[in-house]
Amino acid sequence: MTMDSGADNQQSGDAAVTEAESQQMTVQAQPQIATLAQVSMPAAHATSSAPTVTLVQLPNGQTVQVHGVIQAAQPSVIQSPQVQTVQISTIAESEDSQESVDSVTDSQKRREILSRRPSYRKILNDLSSDAPGVPRIEEEKSEEETSAPAITTVTVPTPIYQTSSGQYIAITQGGAIQLANNGTDGVQGLQTLTMTNAAATQPGTTILQYAQTTDGQQILVPSNQVVVQAASGDVQTYQIRTAPTSTIAPGVVMASSPALPTQPAEEAARKREVRLMKNREAARECRRKKKEYVKCLENRVAVLENQNKTLIEELKALKDLYCHKSD
């Protein structure tokens, strides 16, 4: 029975080997089992689902068919998270680098603060040691207190202008104008004229300002002119002109005294113009009404002349009729 089954297995194995390409391998086993065996694996019938059939030939010529237990490696569905590992390592490296940069920056700031503190304390101690009664500063103030800007009050000097006649004109910040002759010392006891400030306008326009004299009278002057009232009561106006830098030093202005009408004269001139305008309109209306009246009279005269002619003709006709009846 054993020999018959072995012959059948050998015939089927030879048929399988002839149908497909086989791979032979030599396996050396223990001396009590077998010394040399040929293993043939059919590659055509091997699939992932069916077990592999292996033909083992013993040294005595007997062939045995053995079902393989080891299956071929199948491709795995689960992939290894290599990309995630790389990302995690990169993030860890960036965090480490950021921490290292922050630590280096903190150390540099701390080093700068430590290097600056002794210098500030030394300077403050040196300054406080010179003045008696000023305590030494041992603790440094916070950066907000030290960084507060100091407010310094600066007094702007009053500009003083000198005219060609030797008279000094001082213009204060409030808009007041002070005048002084050449013989007075300094600018004390000057005559003051108060002028209102004018807003900035377009070039070429004339700005009028009210100037108040010492007696309380207000006059209207342009913004580029200065009114001067002498001790005798005479009022003079000076026009300030900016001289070119090539002919005169900066800060000195030229003054001239053009004739400027006062406010009452301007008011009288304005009233006179209004009165003349009204008179012209009234004369024009009177001439128009006169022409209309004359034309109406001429029409009436023409009507009366026609009526007179008609009456004369009727009178002649009545006379002729009366003469015939009398005959």
Swiss-Prot record:
It is found in: Nucleus. One of its GO terms (biological process) is cellular response to transforming growth factor beta stimulus. Coiled coil: none annotated. There is a cross-link at residues 271, 290 (Glycyl lysine isopeptide (Lys-Gly) (interchain with G-Cter in SUMO1)). There is a cross-link at residue 122 (Glycyl lysine isopeptide (Lys-Gly) (interchain with G-Cter in SUMO2)). Residues 20-29 have a biased composition (Polar residues). Keywords: Activator, Biological rhythms, Differentiation, DNA-binding, Isopeptide bond, Nucleus, Phosphoprotein, Transcription, Transcription regulation, Ubl conjugation. It comes from the Eukaryota. Residues 297-318 are annotated as: Leucine-zipper. Residues 269-327 form the bZIP domain. GO terms for molecular function: arrestin family protein binding; cAMP response element binding; DNA binding; DNA-binding transcription activator activity, RNA polymerase II-specific; DNA-binding transcription factor activity; DNA-binding transcription factor activity, RNA polymerase II-specific; double-stranded DNA binding; enzyme binding. Its main location: nucleus. SMART domains: BRLZ. Interacts with PPRC1. Binds DNA as a dimer. This dimer is stabilized by magnesium ions. Interacts, through the bZIP domain, with the coactivators CRTC1/TORC1, CRTC2/TORC2 and CRTC3/TORC3. When phosphorylated on Ser-119, binds CREBBP. Interacts with CREBL2; regulates CREB1 phosphorylation, stability and transcriptional activity. Interacts (phosphorylated form) with TOX3. Interacts with ARRB1. Binds to HIPK2. Interacts with SGK1. Interacts with TSSK4; this interaction facilitates phosphorylation on Ser-119. Forms a complex with KMT2A and CREBBP. This is Cyclic AMP-responsive element-binding protein 1. It comes from Rattus norvegicus (Rat). The gene is Creb1.
